[in-house]
Amino acid sequence: MNHPFLIAHQQSPAHDRAWRIGLGVVFLWFLIGGIAHFAATRLEMRIVPPYIPWPHATVLLTGVFELLGAAGLLYRPTRRAAGVGLFALTLAVTPANVYMLQRADLFPIPYWLLVARLPLQIALLALIGWSAVRRGG
């Protein structure tokens, strides 16, 4: 049966389970992150580098993109496009992560966690590429 919410390619059960977990992690990452853009807008605005204009609009717009991308992951015909969009969005927000690391004194977050965010972002990009783009639909 070719159902839009099922995976596009049949793999071994272990591989399929890993793929579903990976896709679930990406979905939850962007769902929670997108909600945070609206629930904690002022906090999110603090991480927008000063050279990026309109921090309030930037936070709200990226929150919308995160939520749309997360929703798009759930439906196979839109999964690949959502994955490409989330991949691009993750690259686009990299300056905020770098800014937080450069200005660690402004944020009540342990420095090691700010350092860890950059390799975690690389891992997130790989996970998006594997779970949503390559096997997307």
Model-derived segments and spans:
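Membrane-interface extramembranous regions
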Residues: 1-137
